[in-house]
Amino acid sequence: MTRVLTALVLAAGLAIPTAAAAQPSLKNPASLTEKAPATYKVRLDTSSGPVVIQVTRDWAPLGADRFYNLVKHGFYDGVRFFRVIPGFMAQGGMNGDPAIQKIWGRNNINDDPVKQSNKRGFVTFAKTGAPNSRSTQIFINYANNANLDAQGFAPFGEVISGMEVVDKFEAYKNVPDQGLITAEGNAYLQRDYPKLTFIKKATIEK
């Protein structure tokens, strides 16, 4: 389990484009600071099926705001869940365009206090062992991972529809290399791990 938890620390198939065309706004993280609503829903249309996440801002305000802005500006479109460990969690959130990932991978937000436990279906930003190291990667808990709470992993939302879809995400476990994802983006993942579940489109539901 120690090895699995350590792997949560970040180095921060269909014929589809290797990366979604980035919106110009994604090149300027400083402009994407809109405050999220108190609650909102995000629909992930994935290659495995639809998943709906309900976000509660009070649980983790900074995380909820970051997720809201990234979804609104198309960051997660085309993104793969590159690390899926059955019984633990499914992790994704590295942009398929290396230039965009380079910008956001070093644009961290401060930590939120942990108000909710990492229960099955809860959605959380990944982080390193250092303070204030959350950027864009998120994970969905497959199990009740309360041991993550004391490590500062603060859930900001939960899957309210489609958890059975999440359970079917393609699992290559720890095989994909985050360094190569950073360097090559979706081109690397599509070439070497073509069955990875990916987000076709992430949208904020009205």
Task: Describe the function of each predicted region.
Residues 13, 19-206:
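Cyclophilin-like peptidyl-prolyl cis-trans isomerases
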Residues 1-8:
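Bacterial N-terminal signal peptides that target proteins for export
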